[in-house]
Amino acid sequence: MPSSDSPFLLDVLGERCPMPVQRIRKVIKEISEGSIIHVLGDDPESIHDIPVLLSRLGLEPPIITRQENGWLFEIKV
């Protein structure tokens, strides 16, 4: 896993619920506290599901940026 100053990129483009959330949860368990995860996804459900997951884990809401092919979620662990 990367250090806290190097974002970890998780590409879930083309994956549908529940896979993006399951993969994010796995990375969060393995990554160092203070790290940043960049998630690229295109499942419209992720706009709702990822913030809910982070809230349940006690983490800050993601920064969400619209991309040409979906969304970029910036998650701070």
Q: Predicted regions span which residues?
A:
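Right-handed parallel beta-helix/beta-solenoid
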Residues: 2-11
